[in-house]
Regions:
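Glycine- and acidic-residue-enriched helix-capping/strand-helix junction motifs
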Residues: 1-9
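N-terminal active-site beta-alpha-beta segment that forms phosphate/nucleotide-binding
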Residues: 9-95, 100-105
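Conserved phosphate- and dinucleotide-binding cores of soluble alpha/beta proteins
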Residues: 98-217
Length: 217
């Protein structure tokens, strides 16, 4: 068999797709970030009539190239939470406004085989927007985010994704030195707000694109 790893993941991704659909998410499968990019631009955006777009911190979103492309689209109000030219106060206000965007795009820290999304935030703006506020949400998910069940998801987030992100962001937290969660009290702590999304409500509000690549942390 050619490309057995890709075939293995095709089977697993299909099963997760079915589980998410049973939980009222709309789900797409993409072979790579290029196809995920096209799904958003050609299949999702034209159906939404969105006038404002924002996003939450996501390496997977950046990997698709959508960040740069969407910013150039005419007729869209862009609430750019990644704009480093803004002051901290201005960026916080953009994040507040993003909660009411027509479309919010982000990633997820983990997704279970049973079709549950698990996220842990520093500020809570991403976790909030996934679950309430924006009219539509698109979540881009690399295959490496799939775990068996909820306990595995929380372990993955606390002891892999969060320490790795703290290192990436050069935070002054104990996990940067130990590589696992110390349940710290540091002012730099990025683990403050958990959300567990068992269902999309209303049905189809959250669209998930499962990508057959390892992406993000």
């Amino acid at each position: 068999m050619d490309k057995p790893i890709e075939h293995y993941w095709q089977i697993r991704l299909k099963a997760v797709k079915e589980a998410l659909e049973a939980n009222h998410f709309e789900v797409f499968l993409a072979k790579d970030v290029g196809e995920a990019n096209k799904i958003v631009k050609d299949q999702i955006l034209p159906t939404l009539g969105a006038k404002s777009v924002s996003w939450g911190g996501s390496m997977t979103f950046l990997a698709t190239g959508l960040y740069e492309e969407i910013k150039k689209m005419p007729g869209l109000e862009i609430l750019d939470t990644f704009d480093r030219s803004k002051s901290p106060e201005e960026n916080m206000e953009i994040r507040r406004r993003a909660v009411l965007a027509d479309l919010f795009i982000t990633g997820t820290n983990a997704v279970t085989e049973g079709g549950i999304l698990v996220n842990l935030d520093m500020l809570g703006n991403r976790a909030c927007s996934i679950n309430f506020g924006p009219k539509h949400v698109v979540i881009l998910v690399g295959r490496n985010k799939i775990v068996s069940e909820l306990d595995d998801a929380m372990y993955r987030v606390k002891n892999y994704a969060a320490p790795a992100n703290a290192m990436r962001l050069e935070k002054k937290t104990p996990c940067v030195k130990t590589s696992y969660c110390e349940d710290c009290k540091s002012p730099d702590r990025i683990c403050n707000v958990w959300t567990i999304t068992e269902k999309s409500f209303p049905k189809g509000r959250i669209r998930v694109i499962l990508i057959n690549q390892d992406l993000g942390l």
